[in-house]
Amino acid sequence: MSADPAAATRPRNRKQLIVEAAGRVFSERGYHAASMEQIAAGVGISAAALYRHFPNKYALFAECADLMADRLVTSLDEVPSGAGLADVLGAVTRVTVAHRASGGVYRWEARYLNSEDRRHLRTKFGHVVGRVDEAVQREYPLPDEQLRAAAALGAIGSIAMHHTSIAQRRADELLLASALRVAATDPAATRSGTRTVELPAQPVPRTRRAEILAAAIPLFARDGFASVTNGQIAEAVGLAPSALYRHYPGKVDILAAACLQAAGLLAQGVDRSLHEVSGPHDAVVALAVTYVAYSFEYTALNSVAEAEVAGLPADLRRPVVLAQREHIAVWEEQLRLARPELDPRQARVLVHAGFGVAVEAGRALRWQDSPAHRDAVTALVVGALGL
C-alpha cells in the first residue's frame, strides 16, 4: 500500500508554521477580523487541516500570544544575570525585529484573551520588564527607572506597528540605540513647560450623529470595536438600535468617523505647534510636545484609532491611512532636517519609535494627566529620536 503523498510532504514543524502564519494574520487584521481560512492559506493548507492542530480560532490566538512572550523570555534567559543594558535590550530587540510581523498580537489584540490567559501572559511579560528594569536602574541610577524601562521597550516594540521596509540589521541597530537613549534620559531633567500647547477642543456634540460618535468612542476603547453592540451605543444616547441607521449605515462607519476625527484633531494640533518655530530641532520638540499632549488629552480616541484601524474595510481605511501618512511625513521631514545623517527610512522608524515610547510610557503612568507626566513622556520621546 502506497504512502499518502500529502503526509509524505507534510513538514514536521507544521504546527509551528501555522502559529507563525496566524501571528501575522492576527497582527495585520485583528483577532475578530482574522479567519481560519486566511490563516490556512498562509500555510498552504485547508481550514479543515488547521482544525487538526487547533480546536478553534481562540486556541490558536492564545498560542500566538504565548509564543511571542516565550521568545522574549528565552532570549533574556540566555543573557547572563548582571549583563549590561545593551546586552539585555539587544536580546529583546533582535527577537522583536525578527518577528515584527506578528508583534501586534500582544500590543493591541491581547485584550481579547480570557482572564486566565491574560494573567499567564502578564506573568511572562512581567519577567521581561523586570529584567529590563533591573538593567536600566543598574546602568543609569536615575529616578523613574520603571517608566524609562517601559518607554525603552515601547521604542523597540514600535517596529511591529508599521510596515517601513528596512534591513533587519539596520533596524536592530537603530532601535537598540533609540532604546538606550530612552533608558539614559532623566524624565525630570527636561521641562517642556516653556512651550504652550494649543490642542483643538474635541467637538461638542450638537447633532444626533455627533452624539452617537461621542458615545461610541469610550465604548470602543473599553471593550474593543468587535465587542460593542449597536444596542449599547444606542442605549448610551437614548435611542432604539434601529435609529442608529438614520445617521450611520453601520457600526463600522462610526469607527471610521472616530478614526478620521482622531486624525483631524492631531493634524490641527500639529499645524498650531509648528507655527513660529525657529528651526528643525524646535520643530521636532514641538511635534513631540503636541503628540504627547494629544495622547493624554484624547486617550480613548487615540487608542481606538491606533488599535482598530486595521479592522476597517479598504474603502473606509484608505482616507485614515492617508491622513496618518501625512502626519508621519511632517515628522520625518523635520527629523531629517534636525539629523541630516538619517535617510528617510531611518527617520520613519525613529518617528514610530517615538510614538511607541509615548504609548508605553503613558500606559505605565496609567494615562494620569498632569504637566509633570506630560513633560516626562515628552523628554523620553525626544530622547528616542536622538535630539
Task: Give residue ranges: language-model regions.
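Helix-turn-helix
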Residues: 17, 21, 25-59, 223-253, ...
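Conserved small-residue-rich
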Residues: 198-266, 355, 359-362
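Hydrophobic, ordered structural segments
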Residues: 68, 89-115, 136-191
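Amphipathic alpha-helical segments used for helix-helix packing
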Residues: 93-119, 153, 295-315, 355-356, ...
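C-terminal peripheral helix-coil segments that are non-catalytic and often amphipathic
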Residues: 1-2, 126-141, 162-226, 367-387
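Amphipathic alpha-helical packing segments from all-alpha helical-bundle domains
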Residues: 115-140, 146-147, 174, 315-339, ...
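Generic hydrophobic, amphipathic alpha-helix propensity
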Residues: 14-22, 39, 64-68, 72, ...
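Hydrophobic alpha-helical connector segments
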Residues: 77-102, 272-299
